[in-house]
């Protein structure tokens, strides 16, 4: 490990944590990315991205963008109500103005993607970046705040622990955490 003090520590190396680490590193901040899985989790969790997010991903992936597989949806299924879970009550559709689909960013209304594939591409960009300390196979155990933010992490394969500090801490460890 290069340092134990960072501008930003990000817990969670899925798409959100990985994208945040790349964006912050581009701004010159020292970043530590902590992800409990040593390799990308093999099953998708997130499945859809809006056009703005697609633009951010295209910019970050750069030359790896052509390797990113996605499918643009023209219409998106049905919205299900809480009271009528098996009965659709409305169809999500892209905005239409004067009979034309509004597509300001050329990515379409919504895009289906494969999260494990995107995570592999983002990890490759993080490795290329050089300004991000990526600790895959490490888990956050405890965090606290004093003058700075402190976090104790554990290497999942060795059991070794280490305490890191940062000015900012981002929790991007998933919806079920």
Q: What kind of region is each of these model predictions?
A:
Residues 136-150:
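A conserved short coil-to-beta-strand element within the FAD-binding core of flavoproteins
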Residues 171-177:
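Flavin (primarily FAD) binding-site architecture
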Residues 45, 49-127:
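Active-site-adjacent segment of FAD-dependent monooxygenases/related oxidoreductases
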Residues 3-33:
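N-terminal Rossmann-like FAD-binding beta1-loop-alpha1 element of flavoenzymes
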């Amino acid at each position: 490990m290069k340092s134990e003090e960072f501008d930003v520590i990000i817990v969670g190396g899925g798409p959100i944590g990985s994208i945040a680490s790349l964006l912050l590193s581009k701004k010159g901040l020292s970043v530590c990315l902590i992800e409990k899985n040593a390799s990308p989790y093999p099953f998708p969790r997130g499945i859809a991205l809006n056009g703005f997010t697609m633009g951010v991903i295209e910019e970050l992936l750069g030359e790896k963008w052509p390797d990113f597989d996605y499918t643009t949806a023209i219409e998106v299924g049905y919205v299900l109500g809480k009271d009528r879970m098996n009965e659709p009550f409305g169809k999500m559709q892209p905005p239409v103005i004067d009979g034309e689909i509004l597509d300001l960013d050329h990515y379409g209304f919504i895009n289906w993607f494969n999260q494990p594939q995107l995570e592999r591409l983002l990890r490759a960009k993080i490795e290329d970046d050089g300004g991000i300390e990526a600790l895959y196979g490490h888990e956050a155990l405890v965090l606290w705040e004093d003058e700075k933010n402190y976090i104790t992490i554990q290497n999942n394969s060795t059991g070794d622990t280490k305490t890191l500090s940062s000015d900012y801490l981002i929790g991007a460890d998933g919806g079920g955490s």
